[in-house]
């Protein structure tokens, strides 16, 4: 199976979302039936291969946010990094270019929210003990950030904003709302 996935990565680099089991089989020098024994469909093969690329992306975003200690900046940087990296990440493009667009619809799924929550809670330097947040409102913040990603991916604007312009746009309109919410005196503990 490792050889099949390695060949799939090679084919994705060449063919992108147009990669088929026939491409992978030809790259390996085996029959399509051999590949089908391990993966029942092209979609399943591409989904499995893309999971590895997505894990790499998540490690990269975690590295980028590791030193961030401001909640608004962490959300903004996460949105900007995701929006600007999708065009350069073949595996993210692969799942976004998938014809049914299930990823765009699933951007606020439980799994996506769990990943976003984990990145903010575990991968940043934010001092959470100084912020008393409820899990419900924190979940809403993560959902909002994911919806912002979804929006900028589906319609980047005309002309599209570069990373610095997008960062400033979000600092102007999103950061004040996050800071007002995070600084509100009401008791808000995670848990």
Ranges and model annotations:
Residues 3, 7, 11-44, 48:
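Helix-turn-helix
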Residues 3, 23, 52, 56, ...:
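Amphipathic alpha-helical interaction segments
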Residues 4-12, 57, 61, 82:
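Short hydrophobic clusters on alpha-helical segments that form packing/core surfaces
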Residues 18, 43-44, 73, 94, ...:
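Residue-level preference for short helical/loop micro-motifs built around acidic side chains
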Residues 48, 61-88:
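Hydrophobic alpha-helical connector segments
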Residues 83-110:
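Amphipathic alpha-helical segments used for helix-helix packing
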Residues 84-88, 142-162, 174-184:
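Amphipathic C-terminal alpha-helical segment
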Residues 103-132, 136-143:
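Amphipathic alpha-helical packing segments from all-alpha helical-bundle domains
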């Amino acid at each position: 199976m490792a050889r099949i996935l390695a060949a799939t990565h090679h084919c994705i680099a060449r063919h992108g979302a147009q990669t088929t089991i026939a491409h992978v089989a030809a790259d390996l020098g085996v029959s399509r039936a051999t590949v089908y024994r391990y993966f029942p469909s092209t979609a399943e093969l591409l989904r499995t291969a893309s999971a590895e690329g997505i894990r790499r992306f998540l490690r990269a975003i975690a590295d980028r946010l590791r030193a961030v200690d401001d909640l608004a900046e962490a959300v903004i940087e996460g949105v900007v990094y995701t929006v600007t990296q999708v065009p350069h990440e073949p595996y993210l493009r692969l799942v976004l270019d998938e014809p049914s667009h299930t990823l765009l619809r699933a951007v606020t799924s439980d799994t996506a929210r769990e990943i976003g929550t984990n990145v903010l809670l575990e991968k940043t330097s934010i001092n959470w003990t100084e912020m008393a947040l409820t899990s419900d409102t924190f979940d809403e913040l993560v959902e909002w950030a994911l919806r912002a990603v979804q929006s900028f991916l589906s319609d980047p604007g005309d002309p599209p904003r570069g990373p610095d312009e997008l960062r400033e746009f979000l600092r102007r309109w999103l950061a004040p709302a996050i800071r007002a919410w995070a600084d509100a005196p009401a008791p808000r503990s995670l848990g």
